Amino acid sequence: MVKIIFFQAHPDDLEHKCGHIMNYLATKSKKEHIIKIASITKGEFGLPGPQYDKFKGELLGKIRTRELFNAEKIHNILPKNIDFFGYLDGFVPFKKDFIKRIIDYLEREKPDVIFAPEAIYSWYYHMDHINTGKAVFYVLHNKLIDYTPNLYFYTSLSPNFFFGFKKKDLTLTYNLIRCHKTQTWLLKWTMLPYRFTSRYAGRKLKGWKYAEPFRKVYFKNKNLKKNKVSFLIRIFTHFYSSLPWFKAKYPKNLLEDNR
């Protein structure tokens, strides 16, 4: 039986990035796959502005955990198959401790396939996402575990693998993001670009109008050339990753404690 682990930095990250492939694997092929989710944080600070500071922290983390559980009911993924790493939203580090946690987790779970945020050529440069993907990639690239599972990145600017779905199944995505009520302020603005990007990805897959795009990462020497991306993507990523992107308004005492 194939085990697949979906890594995410925050509880709502997978819904319009991997929602369709997750639903297919978990509901239409559930006898053949074990699906798990590894959530690095509980999204404790996922509200905009200091006016919401009284809700941020443990309370919001509990609420967003329930929202995640409600969303995964749609996929028939039970809470027992959702693991939390306990890192704080906005403070996911690319450090030895985090890498060791990833190693221990992969050695224990032994997944055959991993989905994770794009670590290098990403269109979404939130550092929690980037560091999650970087840590997973670092472990596999440096052979820090005794086998190499298949790795697929989502939010990639250079996808090479596509999972097709029908237009009517866009309702699945709407249903998933509606479960994350605390994130409506953000997610309501994402559906228009989501429809555009999934429609564009569908053009890459014969016989489909919509698709979820992923980048399969190759580790065997004979396939390393397949990891090469265009010069334009490399230049764009270099520029894009250097921009001063928005950071959540964390309480001052928390920022001081985490310097």
Show where each model-derived region lies.
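Metal-dependent de-N-acetylase/amidase catalytic core
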Residues: 2-5, 92-259
